[in-house]
Amino acid sequence: MMKRWMAMGMALCLTAASLAGCSGTKDAAESTQAEAETSTEEAAAEEETAKESDLDKLTFTYVTSPLNVPTIIEKNQGIFEKTFGDMGIEVDYAELTSGADQTQALASGDVQVLYAVGGTSVILSAANGADIKVLNMYSRSPKAFCMYSKDESLTTPESLRGKTIAGPTGTNLHELLVSYLATAGMTIDDVNYVNMSIPDAKAGLDGGSVDVALVAGATAYNAGQQGYHLVADGEGLIKAIIAVAVTQKFYDEHPEIIEKLEEAQTEIADFMEEKPDETMQIVADELDLDTDAVKSMYDLYDFSTEITDDDKEGFQKTADFMYESGMIDEAFDVNQLFIEK
């Protein structure tokens, strides 16, 4: 009898052990399956992130002059390329120095982001009915925009009457000239204004075909180093606003791009702040200047991207001036320039 009870006990133990083993195997299998499902979901999420935009190429304007430090740092460090490459988007650059060419490229869709466009150009384009919006600021630097001449007798607006003055149209430099002339009740029609890029204007001044060159940044610095006469700079005349612009349509249709662009700009700003010496060297190499020259000019710039009330006032001042000087046909409210979020 005792043996029988012992046999039954052994059987029960074996059964319990077997059940426990089955339960453990089942739990392990379920855990493995859950982990596999999680890995699959994560892989799918990563794939979705990479394909979250239907764009295959994104084109930015690339302008290093007058002293566009964020632009130089961005390309040198490949920040846009990495940011958007992770999304499967190719990054391309359009080297357009004329404000008119930049805004036209945005309107045609050849360029998606104007990465450093003058406030004058933005206002002129918007006033003519184009879809263009300020996403954020790029820089402010009135003292960096200058009028240089070899003729030291050119010290007043009146002394410029009939002179050949060259510089890029639709830009802060264009506004500087018109503003300077306006202080004496003159208009751009009182001078022989020639539309030229900054390098070409400086070359014209060097060669003698131009009386006054509208220059900025490194070119202005070099003109001063050559002993050329500073007729005027933008202090008290212009705000020298430069912005980052897109179309409202692009902003509405591609929020994922806008978000990544803002992150990339933060990365650029962080690099400039955390690595000032390296920043100066990179810019000096790009512009073929010594680092002391870059540091001297850098102090003239405010590269913060936030749009402030002062910036908006600056835009309005520029718009009012453009209307009064006949650059635009009707008074313009700059509040319509900013993104409708």
Map each language-model feature to its residues:
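Bacterial lipoprotein signal-peptidase II cleavage site
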Residues: L19-A43
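Extracytoplasmic "Venus flytrap"
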Residues: E52, L58-N76, G170
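Short loop->beta-strand "edge-of-pocket" segments that line small-molecule binding or catalytic clefts
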Residues: L58-T64, E158-G170, D270
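Pocket-flanking alpha-helical
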Residues: N68-E74, A94-D131, K143-P157, L173-E175, ...
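Ligand-binding cleft/hinge of the Venus flytrap
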Residues: I73-I89, H174-Y193, G224-Q225, Q281
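Pocket-lining segment of extracytoplasmic ligand-binding domains
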Residues: T120, D190-V194, P199-V283
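Flexible hinge/capping segments at coil-to-helix
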Residues: S149-T164, D252-E256
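Secondary-structure end/capping motifs
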Residues: E253-M327
